[in-house]
Design a protein with these regions (language model features):
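Short hydrophobic alpha-helices at membrane interfaces in multi-pass membrane enzymes
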Residues: 138-168, 207-212, 298-304
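Periplasmic/luminal catalytic loop of GT-C fold multi-pass membrane glycosyltransferases
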Residues: 470-527
Length: 541
């Protein structure tokens, strides 16, 4: 029951407050599309609409605690779906000897990267990919055609319709819906490669069916009202990933989650996570390349290679790699017990009639020696297993202890008040201001959700902003004079800045606080709110 144990571990380590600040603008958009008072690109495609409706519905029932429980269950389902096809690939003896070690490895990885298990649209994408992981290889299998007719079997036809419906829903959950057709291409590449190795010529109708499935998946965006704009959306994501256009280059270089783990490691950010991430991705790349070199490249190895490359390009893609990595690790594990048994058997003096022991001692002594060696062999062969199991249990207990301790430190509201301005936003709702509001991108979504009447400057939807706008926004942190000039020209009457967990704005805050045109109206240990008096602007007029 390896997949079930890993799923439970994923559920447990996914229980923590809503640390991803983007969830708040998703919740705000679920209520009403959020418009910033600053200019945005057009056309606007709300590719997250269905995801926003779901999280908004869950939040409306039970608030942040229920949303945390909901996403924890979904993460468990994701890993269960990816590991489900392998539940019968191992013998019972192999499972007993390797399951505990495998679960320990998974638990250790989950603990290190637990804060990646957030409630984001990528979670829905992984859920749909997990379903595809189980269904698409069966749908595209030639044996699923009826032997008497050229039609699909009813079960296969039902699975195909289910996949197409999921793809249609996926198009309005996240721009990564393109992973569905790409995974279908990977399945076809693996199947056609196997057929080529075995010198099997696939029937023409089967090849046409394969191509038709991929084209049908690609056509799903056109069944929505946004049509072409929705179809082109993934190209914008690719642009942001590699930084081909100026605005995407700014995003790729300035947003931490979109930077490579190598870049983050050299900057000294999340050093432990980055080192482990790079090591795991490198292991995945080496394993995939080695199997390809040996001529045994399959679907897992294709996906492992692709997701490892994506994770090394941008840290946020690591969650795409992790389920595939666990599948690959599960299918290629090595057992120390097998080597121990081989050594013991080679040393055992009870095999063969011409063995040296039979020449040196009699038959009765041989029987006694046989039982003695058998007993010693069982002890020797079981010793590594006992040590391994004991070590695994100790490590799992240690991780669970740290996890339980972390639960005590969380606020019962399950809102990460260190990352969003909980106290400041509550104060601002009852203390209105004149002019526009300036906020940083991480606080924008929460402010829009808590106080929708006060239009925000920016939120996490960077794809809606131009390169010039984003570059000028980032310059404010290092050029206080530029910010104060724009505050006058743009009629900014209030500004809110983080004080601790996002240190970009420290220099600007230190200049604004003593300035005569700015007044501190709210301050706590995490956020500061300042009002702008416009005195200089009035005197000039």
């Amino acid at each position: 029951m390896f997949f079930l144990a890993v799923a439970v571990a994923a559920v447990l380590f996914s229980i923590f407050p809503l640390t991803d600040t983007d969830i708040w603008w998703h919740l705000a958009c679920a209520r009403e599309w959020v418009q910033t008072w600053t200019p945005s690109r057009s056309p606007v495609v709300n590719v997250h609409e269905y995801f926003q409706r779901v999280v908004g519905f869950v939040y409306g029932i039970g608030g942040a605690p229920l949303l945390v429980a909901f996403k924890a269950v979904l993460w468990g389902i994701v890993f269960a779906l990816f590991l489900l096809p392998q539940r019968k690939t191992c013998t019972e003896s192999q499972s007993k000897s390797a399951t505990l070690a495998g679960v320990t490895l998974a638990a250790l990885i989950f603990f290190i990267f637990r804060y990646h298990f957030e409630i984001r649209p990528v979670l829905v994408s992984l859920l749909f990919l997990g379903i595809y992981w189980n269904l698409l290889p069966k749908i595209l299998n030639s044996s699923r055609f009826s032997t008497r007719t050229s039609s699909l079997e009813p079960r296969t036809f039902f699975m195909l319709i289910s996949v197409l419906v999921i793809q249609w829903l996926w198009c309005k959950c996240q721009g990564l819906y393109i992973l569905g057709p790409l995974f279908a291409v990977a399945v076809l590449a693996s199947a056609w490669l196997d057929a080529w190795r075995l010198k099997i010529k696939l029937p023409k109708r089967l090849r046409l069916f394969h191509v038709g499935v991929v084209l049908a998946l690609l056509a799903m965006p056109f069944l929505h009202s946004e049509g072409l704009n929705l179809f082109l959306y993934p190209f914008g994501l690719l642009d942001r990933l590699v930084g081909m256009t100026p605005s995407a280059a700014v995003f790729a270089s300035e947003i931490a989650e979109n930077r490579s783990p190598f870049t983050l490691l050299m900057a000294g950010e999340n050093a432990l996570e980055c080192v482990v991430m790079i090591a795991l991705c490198a292991a995945g790349l080496v394993f995939a390349a080695w199997t390809a070199f040996k001529g045994r490249c399959g679907l897992i190895h294709i996906c492992l290679f692709a997701t490892a490359v994506l994770a090394l390009i941008a840290e946020r893609n690591f969650v795409l790699f992790l389920p595939v990595f666990l599948c690959g690790a599960r299918g290629s594990r090595f057992e120390a017990r097998g080597l121990t048994r081989l050594v013991v058997r080679s040393l055992s003096p009870v095999e063969g009639p011409n063995h040296v022991s039979r020449l040196l001692i009699g038959d009765n002594s041989t029987k006694v020696l046989k039982h003695l060696v058998s007993y010693i062999s069982s002890l020797v062969s079981s010793f590594p297993s006992l040590v391994s199991r004991l070590s695994s249990l100790v490590l799992i207990g240690f991780l669970l202890g740290l996890w339980a301790r972390s639960l005590l430190a969380y606020d019962s509201s399950m809102v990460a008040f260190q990352r969003v301005p909980v106290g400041a936003a509550a104060w601002m709702t009852i203390h209105p201001h004149e002019g526009h509001l300036f906020n940083d991108d991480r606080a924008g979504g929460y402010l829009a959700f808590v106080n929708p009447d006060d239009s925000i400057y920016i939120d996490g939807r960077f794809i809606l902003k131009t390169a010039d706008f984003f570059e000028r926004y980032l310059r404010y942190a290092d050029e206080p004079a530029l910010f104060m000039h724009d505050a006058d020209s743009l009629h900014i009457g209030r500004a809110i800045f983080p004080l601790r967990y996002y240190a970009r704005w420290g220099n600007l805050v230190s200049v604004l606080v003593p300035h005569e045109d700015w007044e501190v109206v709210y301050r706590d240990s995490l956020y500061i709110v300042l009002n702008h008096s416009f005195r200089n602007l009035v005197s000039e007029r």
